[in-house]
Amino acid sequence: MAVPKKKKSKSKRNQRHAVWKGKAAIAAQKAISLGKSILTGKAQGFVYPIEEEEEE
């Protein structure tokens, strides 16, 4: 006979949710930091194309 599963507690659910939100916050912070370093030109791990001016 089918028996319903035990219900997880709200505190456990909130704990898992907090972990997920924390990981998302860390990823967002890294993305912001990377974007700032690219915009300022201080990023060392990227190769930027050099625009050559044509002289006539």
UniProtKB/Swiss-Prot annotation:
Pfam families: Ribosomal_L32p
GO MF annotation, one: structural constituent of ribosome
Gene Ontology CC annotations of this record: large ribosomal subunit
Domain of life from the UniProt record: Bacteria
Record key words, sorted: Ribonucleoprotein, Ribosomal protein
Biological processes per GO annotation: translation
NCBIfam families per the UniProt record, alphabetical: rpmF_bact
HAMAP family (UniProt xref): Ribosomal_bL32
Family: Belongs to the bacterial ribosomal protein bL32 family.
Protein's name according to its UniProt entry: Large ribosomal subunit protein bL32
Natural source organism: Prochlorococcus marinus (strain MIT 9215)
Gene (UniProt): rpmF
